[in-house]
From Swiss-Prot:
Its EC number is 2.2.1.9. Homodimer. GO terms for molecular function: 2-succinyl-5-enolpyruvyl-6-hydroxy-3-cyclohexene-1-carboxylic-acid synthase activity; magnesium ion binding; manganese ion binding; thiamine pyrophosphate binding. Keywords: Magnesium, Manganese, Menaquinone biosynthesis, Metal-binding, Thiamine pyrophosphate, Transferase. Pfam families: TPP_enzyme_C (PF02775), TPP_enzyme_M_2 (PF16582), TPP_enzyme_N (PF02776). It comes from Leuconostoc mesenteroides subsp. mesenteroides (strain ATCC 8293 / DSM 20343 / BCRC 11652 / CCM 1803 / JCM 6124 / NCDO 523 / NBRC 100496 / NCIMB 8023 / NCTC 12954 / NRRL B-1118 / 37Y). Gene3D superfamilies: 3.40.50.970, TPP-binding domain. This is 2-succinyl-5-enolpyruvyl-6-hydroxy-3-cyclohexene-1-carboxylate synthase.
Length: 541
């Protein structure tokens, strides 16, 4: 049985490699022993394989997500049986909601140990339910040539499914009996027949666009697949582009900070479009979608997963890559389009920010071209959307699928592990607290990441929400002050610590060379931050 396990596991690994997978994140455990050992041996023999070990499965899931999001390719998670696999759930949920390909290899107890009180045993087949595109079971210890052929085929099939739009996670469950030790240092002739899955070619007949005033809303663009086409299209046709901070579109022709402009009531009737074409996922600004609906503006949604619209406002969903749409669109625009475009580009911009917002403008000035920036949810991503300009060479990421605050540190470290230059994470203290364990990967792998922590002592975003209208219970239930010492967190993980007294000093820290992770703390107050935001809005009105 050991020989069969060894041989079939090698086929499993080779099939994953043939499917384009190069990154594996392992969380140690007993039941996953044969896969982990043979994977380590495989990685030693193949320098294309990158193997990371993360002792915390929850962190590992998001570390893998960060790599997959950055490289736009599937990443493997390997974990042991029981609740360990369930710890991947938050990352799988984010991968599902954000269309990120993940491959979960869940090792399991054999069928005779199921449902009878065996330790470290839970029902694992299809554990993630609707969050995975497919869940399959492979019995690596079954001795039959058909099983080996099945492994070769099914692994390639489900990995291909994970990268087929809409992309998403898949699970391969692997029940294993003892003995679990494989045969190492054995030369096996492992040949996996590569399967080529051709993409379905669909000729979509686009309706001609006739509009007096056309506007494009560029939403999150993880693939960075349409920026060049959008630039050519917008300049050629004088079409204004509202660019979400995650759209990767940062040019002179793009309009940023739409949320703050809408709050300042700067969008009047002259700026109302006849047609809006939306690209990508849901934008950071909820206000812009609300505006489209309240003003009853004709809206199309173009995306490989088009039709995902929680506002239920779009009138046409075109399942098509935005790049292809832009290349094949037929336009008949009126002479008013030039004037319309100019009015949008002439909208006032925020010229003075305060306090926490100054961190964004300081970051804007400090980060060099080609920098990868990961942004936490809640206030950081909203402030980035409103106040960061940057340029088109910089890549900005966030976990905006399920929009949770968990796993952000690990996701950013995963990003940092696969890019060549230093990267940056912008986060709050509560998000840091949620994923402190992720810092172990920074310690173990010496990853070049600058973590900027805006410490306003708790859940700052609630100060902007209706909950702030219940002051008697606000701090207890929503403000939730943590009162944690960020420097001691840095000391615990042997990370360099810097206290930022004024935002303008950020540039000097970021420009100081370092090959490891740094924790940069800026202390703030969420009540003051709320007041500062209101004053900035008043100045814009």
């Amino acid at each position: 049985m050991t020989d069969t396990l060894t041989f079939n596991t090698k086929h499993l690994l080779e099939a994953l490699f043939e499917s384009g997978i190069r990154h594996f994140i392992v969380s140690p455990g007993s039941r996953s022993t044969p896969i982990a050992l043979l994977l380590a041996e495989y990685a030693e023999q193949n320098n294309e394989i990158k193997l990371f070990v993360d002792v915390d499965e929850r962190s590992a899931g998001f570390f893998a997500l960060g790599i997959a999001k950055t490289l736009l390719e599937p990443v493997v998670l390997l974990g042991t049986s029981g609740t360990a696999i369930a710890e991947y759930m938050p990352a799988v949920a984010e991968a599902y909601a954000a269309n990120i390909p993940l491959v979960v290899l869940s090792t399991d107890r054999p069928q005779e140990l199921q449902f009878n009180g065996a330790p470290q045993t839970i029902p694992q087949s299809n554990l993630f339910g609707q969050l995975t595109k497919q869940a399959v079971l492979i019995r690596l210890q079954d001795m039959h040539s058909d099983v080996t052929e099945y492994i070769d085929f099914i692994v390639q099939k489900v990995v291909n499914l994970s990268i087929t739009a809409p992309r998403g996670p898949i699970q391969i469950n692997l029940p294993l009996r003892k003995p679990l030790m494989p045969v190492l240092d054995r030369q096996d002739e492992v040949h996996v027949q590569r399967v080529v899955f051709d993409k379905q070619s669909v000729q979509y007949r686009l309706p001609p666009i006739t509009a007096k005033r056309l506007l494009i809303l560029a939403g999150p663009n993880v693939l960075n697949s349409y920026d060049d086409s959008l630039k050519k299209f917008a300049i050629k046709n004088n079409v204004p582009v509202i660019a979400d901070v995650l759209s990767q579109s940062r040019h002179t022709y793009t309009i940023h900070g739409i949320d703050v402009l809408l709050q300042a009531h700067k969008i009047n009737a002259d700026l109302k479009p006849d047609l809006v074409v939306r690209f990508g996922k849901t934008p950071v600004s909820a206000r812009v979608l609300q505006w489209l609906k309240e003003e009853n503006i004709l809206t199309w949604h173009v995306d490989e997963d088009a039709g995902v619209d929680h506002t239920r406002h779009i009138v046409r969903a075109i399942k098509m890559a935005p790049h292809d749409f832009l290349e094949s669109m037929h336009l008949t625009l009126s002479k008013n389009q030039i004037d319309f475009n100019q009015k949008w580009l002439s909208l006032p911009k925020v010229i003075k920010t305060r306090n926490e917002m100054n961190i964004i403008t300081a970051l804007d000035d400090a980060v060099p071209d080609d920098t990868h920036i990961f942004v936490a949810n809640s206030m950081p991503i909203r402030d980035m959307d409103n106040f960061f300009t940057g340029n088109h060479t910089q890549r900005i990421y966030a976990n905006r699928g399920a929009n949770g605050i968990d796993g952000v540190i690990s996701s950013a470290l995963g990003m940092s592990a696969v890019v060549k230059q230093r990267s940056v994470l912008l986060t709050g203290d509560l998000t840091l607290f949620h994923d402190m364990n992720g810092l172990m990967m920074a310690k173990n792998y010496q990853l070049p990441l600058d973590i900027i922590v805006i410490n306003n002592n708790g859940g700052g975003i609630f100060s902007f929400l209706p909950q702030a209208g219940a002051p008697k219970y606000f701090e207890q239930l929503f403000g939730t002050p943590l009162n944690i010492d960020i420097k001691k967190i840095a000391d615990l993980y042997y990370i360099d610590y810097h206290q930022l007294n004024v935002p303008e000093a950020l540039s000097q820290i970021l420009q100081t060379p370092s090959k490891t992770t740094r924790l940069i703390e800026y202390k703030s107050d969420h009540q003051r931050n709320r007041d500062d935001h209101r004053e900035v809005l008043e100045m814009l009105k």
